[in-house]
């Protein structure tokens, strides 16, 4: 029987792509095995490679802060991982062959956890999950801030793309957008069925579009 611990052991010893040659530690992911919210980034950075844990650098601290302050959850109440489990040299973008080799680990993690919500952080994780859903991906700017329903193995998982926390570290405007997206995630976590219905009635979460227009018109 598959388990998160088994996946962890396989990732730590994995040599399926060239990235194993450069790593200090592989980064399988961590968190609550029955988490309702799963965060998926692109790949580990320097700090993550040193510690063998996801999102422990500056971007990770921002993510942890938003999980606590906006979602009202502790970090160990969610699950955090990446599409690629080893750090690409010099923090370059992961390459397609690396994603192809490594993504089955993520697929298995999703199978085991079966979260209510998958939050994709940045374009690489969003593009990968969208490919699994059969959705077209254009850019993170165009798809972020909306919820999508993934019909997966007789279950509906809400997929919510947003910016990677690293992009918001030195950009106050992006940080504000990221914070607003996390407020939307909080509401989705509270009342997920409402947004599933909205999806089928009006497409990609029309309720948020209406609310944003209302807030804009009221000067909020």
Swiss-Prot record:
CDD domains: UDG-F4_TTUDGA_SPO1dp_like (cd10030). SUPFAM superfamilies: Uracil-DNA glycosylase-like. It comes from Sulfurisphaera tokodaii (strain DSM 16993 / JCM 10545 / NBRC 100140 / 7) (Sulfolobus tokodaii). Changing residue 171 to A: No change in activity. The lineage of its organism: Archaea, Thermoproteota, Thermoprotei, Sulfolobales, Sulfolobaceae. This is Type-4 uracil-DNA glycosylase. Keywords: 4Fe-4S, DNA damage, DNA repair, Hydrolase, Iron, Iron-sulfur, Metal-binding. It catalyses: Hydrolyzes single-stranded DNA or mismatched double-stranded DNA and polynucleotides, releasing free uracil. It is an enzyme of class 3 (hydrolase). Coiled coil: none annotated. Changing residue 169 to A: No change in activity. Belongs to the uracil-DNA glycosylase (UDG) superfamily. Type 4 (UDGa) family. One of its GO terms (biological process) is DNA repair. GO terms for molecular function: 4 iron, 4 sulfur cluster binding; metal ion binding; uracil DNA N-glycosylase activity. Removes uracil bases that are present in DNA as a result of either deamination of cytosine or misincorporation of dUMP instead of dTMP. [4Fe-4S] cluster binds at residues 14, 17, 86, 102.
């Amino acid at each position: 029987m598959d388990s998160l611990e088994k996946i962890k052991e396989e990732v730590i010893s994995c040599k399926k792509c060239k990235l194993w040659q450069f790593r200090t530690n592989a980064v399988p992911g961590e968190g609550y095995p029955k988490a309702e919210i799963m965060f998926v980034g692109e790949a580990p950075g320097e700090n993550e490679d040193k510690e063998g844990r996801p999102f422990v650098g500056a971007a990770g601290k921002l993510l942890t802060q938003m999980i606590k302050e906006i979602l009202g959850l502790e970090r160990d109440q969610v699950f955090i991982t990446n599409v690629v489990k080893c750090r690409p040299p010099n923090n370059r973008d992961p390459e397609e062959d690396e994603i192809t080799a490594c993504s089955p680990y993520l697929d298995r993690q999703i199978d085991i956890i079966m979260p209510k919500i998958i939050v994709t952080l940045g374009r690489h994780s969003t593009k990968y999950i969208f490919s699994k859903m059969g959705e077209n991906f254009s850019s993170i700017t165009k798809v972020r801030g909306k919820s999508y329903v993934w019909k997966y193995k007789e279950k509906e998982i809400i997929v919510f793309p947003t910016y990677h926390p690293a992009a918001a570290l030195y950009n106050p405007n992006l940080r504000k957008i990221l914070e607003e997206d996390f407020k939307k995630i909080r509401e989705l976590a509270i009342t997920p069925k409402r947004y599933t219905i909205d999806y089928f009635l009006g497409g990609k979460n029309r309720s948020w579009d209406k609310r944003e227009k209302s807030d804009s018109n009221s000067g909020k």
